[in-house]
Amino acid sequence: MVKAIAVLKGDAGVSGVVHFEQEADAAVTTISWNITGFEPNTEHGFHIHEFGDVTNGCTSSGSHFNPFKKTHGSPEDENRHVGDMGNVLADANGVAVGSAKDPLIKIFGPTSILGRTVVVHAGKDDLGRGGNEESLKTGNAGPRPACGVIGIAN
């Protein structure tokens, strides 16, 4: 099993940790998260971006990780970016905790997420259903209050 981690930080009070686990090259990856500092009862876009560059905060992490040149979608869609992880839901205390399994996200191989950046967005991801061109690129999720580079975990 290989494990990876991204420690999310930003300048808006949002912070957290995202864990990735994959048993073998062809296996589904398990993602789990614990993110704090949101407004209560809100949803936030949650993506893997193409670069592990946070020199200018989260904006230098580039676009969603999209090695297969697809349009933006939900994690359940066949036509989606590899980095499309949907939304995280903050509870009444502004904390988002959850997990998911994803067949496209890989720690191993040519489409590895290692060295890329997890970004949590200020707004809800419309999952590519917003009816405009930006929806098909970003899900209209808005600014990037926190992010973290994905690295190998212990």
Curated annotation (Swiss-Prot):
It comes from the Eukaryota. GO terms for molecular function: copper ion binding; oxidoreductase activity, acting on a sulfur group of donors, oxygen as acceptor; superoxide dismutase activity. Its EC number is 1.15.1.1. Disulfide bonds join 58-147. Cu cation binds at residues 47, 49, 64, 121. Keywords: Antioxidant, Copper, Cytoplasm, Disulfide bond, Metal-binding, Oxidoreductase, Zinc. Its main location: cytoplasm. GO terms for cellular component: cytosol; mitochondrial intermembrane space; nucleus; superoxide dismutase complex. SUPFAM superfamilies: Cu,Zn superoxide dismutase-like. Destroys radicals which are normally produced within the cells and which are toxic to biological systems. Belongs to the Cu-Zn superoxide dismutase family. This is Superoxide dismutase [Cu-Zn]. It comes from Eremothecium gossypii (strain ATCC 10895 / CBS 109.51 / FGSC 9923 / NRRL Y-1056) (Yeast).
